[in-house]
């Protein structure tokens, strides 16, 4: 009996322990859920704070851009002093320009700059691209899609470097590594004596002005032709309508116009006779004034 009571006590203790463990686990789960909720709420708060910071930053950036634009408008360009102007003119006099009449196919400006910079420092470089018609035709028939340049100009800081570059590269291979794409290509380059970069810009501006003038003249001629064509069409419509009305009237009146030829519709305008008071004019054109009867009566009484 004593053993049975002890077993029952142990069983009750085990049940109590199990209940305690269940309560502990439930409380653990609840604490985990609460922690998760707290973390979510903290994350939401952080996100809201970040959004507020972003909005604040965007407002600050907008204000800064507005202020910068205002400052840029208010900035007045300072005039060069005579000393600075003289230095700039000396720099321009030292520069030399080379003309490239033939450029290797599909060579980019960066590659050309790296090739020519072996002879000296390069300031400006301009390459003339090919026409759009030739490019589209080449691509249409399965050609290369890269850009191709037909001519170019290069400005060296020192004219001695420009002369050296033109003397060594003109009509010769580019060379370099045999595996390079432009190893066997030939460049035609010429040094332009007494030619500066602003001369090139002036020439391009003149060409653009001439092109614009030609285009405007062609447009005006085309507009005149269109106007004359429209006027002729309107006149022909008007004449056709007049002829149709005349035919309708004649059909109503029952006149027989089978033998009569159709006369052209012309307007009869009243015109004054030509007259002239010049001495060398013809007698038919001279203006002959009618004699005044009252004046003749007075003169007859006097004399």
UniProtKB/Swiss-Prot annotation:
Bias type Basic and acidic residues, positions: 258-267, 284-296
Keyword RNA-binding set for record: yes
Family label: Belongs to the ESF2/ABP1 family.
Main location: nucleus
Cellular compartments annotated: Nucleus, Nucleolus
Superkingdom, natural source: Eukaryota
The RRM domain, residue ranges: 96-186
Name of the protein: Pre-rRNA-processing protein ESF2
Molecular function terms from GO: RNA binding
Keyword field: Nucleus, Ribosome biogenesis, RNA-binding, rRNA processing
GO cellular component entries: nucleolus
Organism the protein comes from: Debaryomyces hansenii (strain ATCC 36239 / CBS 767 / BCRC 21394 / JCM 1990 / NBRC 0083 / IGC 2968)
Start-end of Acidic residues biased regions: 1-21
Region Disordered, annotated ranges: 1-25, 243-303
Record SUPFAM superfamilies: RNA-binding domain, RBD
PANTHER family named among the record's database cross-references: ACTIVATOR OF BASAL TRANSCRIPTION 1 (PTHR12311:SF7)
Described function: Involved in the small subunit (SSU) processome assembly and function, and in the 18S rRNA synthesis. Required for the early cleavages at sites A0, A1 and A2.
Gene: ESF2
Cross-referenced InterPro entries: ABT1/Esf2, ABT1/ESF2_RRM, Nucleotide-bd_a/b_plait_sf, RBD_domain_sf
Classification via Gene3D superfamilies: 3.30.70.330
Record-level GO BP terms: endonucleolytic cleavage in 5'-ETS of tricistronic rRNA transcript (SSU-rRNA, 5.8S rRNA, LSU-rRNA); endonucleolytic cleavage in ITS1 to separate SSU-rRNA from 5.8S rRNA and LSU-rRNA from tricistronic rRNA transcript (SSU-rRNA, 5.8S rRNA, LSU-rRNA); endonucleolytic cleavage to generate mature 5'-end of SSU-rRNA from (SSU-rRNA, 5.8S rRNA, LSU-rRNA); small-subunit processome assembly
